[in-house]
Design a protein with these regions (language model features):
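Nucleic acid-binding interface residues in structured DNA/RNA-binding domains
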Residues: 1-105
Length: 105
């Protein structure tokens, strides 16, 4: 059975470690197509299992959270990340410190 694009995205998002974040583009590339960044956003907005697919760990390349975070808005996303120890500088995730270092093949 072939995985759908959303399933590929969810599999990558599940791998983001506790206390770290990844970018939409990073998830897109790891899921198979670096041009899927916008699709990653759609997939996360339709997340069927937020308890097991930590979509709140995905931020934009500058480290900004989504105002349209589907599970409580940007403030909820910030709250969830802070609970994991992720620090923010002027409202942005400190990407040098918290970006997931998973290599892209």
């Amino acid at each position: 059975m072939q995985q759908s694009t959303f399933e590929k995205i969810y599999e990558v998002v599940k791998q983001i470690p506790y206390g770290q974040v990844a970018t939409y583009g990073q998830i897109a590339a790891l899921a198979g197509n670096k041009r899927w960044a916008r699709v990653v956003g759609y997939a996360l907005h339709a997340n069927p299992d937020p308890d097991n697919i930590p979509c709140y760990r995905v931020v934009n390349k500058e480290g900004r959270v989504s105002d349209a975070f589907a599970f409580g808005g940007g403030n909820k996303q910030i709250e969830l990340l802070k609970e994991e120890g992720v620090e923010f500088i002027n409202g942005y995730v400190d990407m040098k410190k918290y970006q997931w270092e998973r290599p892209i093949y």
